[in-house]
Amino acid sequence: MGRTREAGCVAAGVVIGAGACYCVYRLAWGRDENEKIWDEDEESTDTSEIGVETVKGAKTNAGAGSGAKLQGDSEVKPEVSLGLEDCPGVKEKAHSGSHSGGGLEAKAKALFNTLKEQASAKAGKGARVGTISGNRTLAPSLPCPGGRGGGCHPTRSGSRAGGRASGKSKGKARSKSTRAPATTWPVRRGKFNFPYKIDDILSAPDLQKVLNILERTNDPFIQEVALVTLGNNAAYSFNQNAIRELGGVPIIAKLIKTKDPIIREKTYNALNNLSVNAENQGKIKTYISQVCDDTMVCRLDSAVQMAGLRLLTNMTVTNHYQHLLSYSFPDFFALLFLGNHFTKIQIMKLIINFTENPAMTRELVSCKVPSELISLFNKEWDREILLNILTLFENINDNIKNEGLASSRKEFSRSSLFFLFKESGVCVKKIKALANHNDLVVKVKVLKVLTKL
């Protein structure tokens, strides 16, 4: 029974030692925060071996009972292997502890001391468990999982340090594997380390760097990050001027032509923030017709369309550039009828900007509109839509009176906005029906409109 008990204690000590080795391995692997875990195709028979190799020096001789020993501070290559057959020092101490009758605690302590010596030797030389020898390279461009721009998956250009690459093993002789080497994981590109965070508030030199990156790259991932960074900085007035002075508006606006809807959306968002500045509007006006055309033909209710409508709304807050969009009035009203709730609200804000400019009244009321537009005056719509459509009607009605267009009704067709709002009488009936609306704000707005009729 004595030898059986002794063998059981040795086995328990080996299990504890293996666990401690794994902990040392995990801690050493986590020391380098800038390195990623490299995915490798390992054979199932080699999972117990992990080699440790320092930058310079000679290998230590892990003799019986001595464990891993340093032969010099700068010229040592300690080799640590986690298999029992490759750890004679660990075995020796475990057996010596069992012969002395120290029990399970003594054996575990002996194992821990040996591992501690090996770990301290490794830490002193800055070695890394499971490192890969040779240079790291990036595979050529192919799509990879994990995101739009793709992470980078390094490939190996050298042999694995440790048990398999050391040439000689300390245990049984191992036959060479006949298995063909695994192919490297193809990636689209290396991950680009953008120099700034997207929410950083940048100075003029930093903005110049971002603009240079945006101008030179064709990578959609980098373009998106750069546009978001510029758009966030354009929310601040001092950076609105800086981006314009650095020639940033043409650099950003050239991406309107890209086919990628995400890039176009980010481009419109950046230009939208820049358009708050009156001087920037003078630069953006060159592209306003192009933005309008793209907004009308892109997918209905898409994020690109909403971003384009927001930009057009900002550009028409003043009267300076409204005439550049007068050719699109029929498209605006068609979109008002076809769009979803959010598109309807945004397009009504855009049209209201035109109704506040009396000089645009004639072109506005003479355009053709769908007769179904009258359905927007139904009480089933929510407050925001009703308030906007009532404001639109109020402004047009006031402008018709102020511009004296009521006497020129013959020049407007039956499909025009003038006929729908002024001559048909259907619109007035719909508005009167809203006088009993449950929402007090809507009811007050209806009464205000009716008093002006």
UniProtKB/Swiss-Prot annotation:
Family membership: Belongs to the eutherian X-chromosome-specific Armcx family.
One GO BP annotation of this record: hematopoietic stem cell homeostasis
Protein's name in the database: Armadillo repeat-containing X-linked protein 1
Tissue: Expressed at high levels ovary, heart, testis, prostate, brain, spleen and colon. Expressed at very low levels in liver and thymus. Not expressed in peripheral blood leukocytes. Not or reduced expressed in lung, prostate, colon, pancreas and ovarian carcinomas.
Quaternary structure note: Interacts with MIRO1.
One GO cellular component term: mitochondrion
Membrane topology: Single-pass membrane protein
Region described as Mitochondrion outer membrane (MOM)-targeting sequence: spans on this chain: 1-6, 26-36
Entries under PANTHER family matching the protein: ARMADILLO REPEAT CONTAINING PROTEIN, ARMADILLO REPEAT-CONTAINING X-LINKED PROTEIN 1
Pfam families membership: Arm_2
Source organism per UniProt: Homo sapiens
Spans traversing the lipid bilayer: 7-29
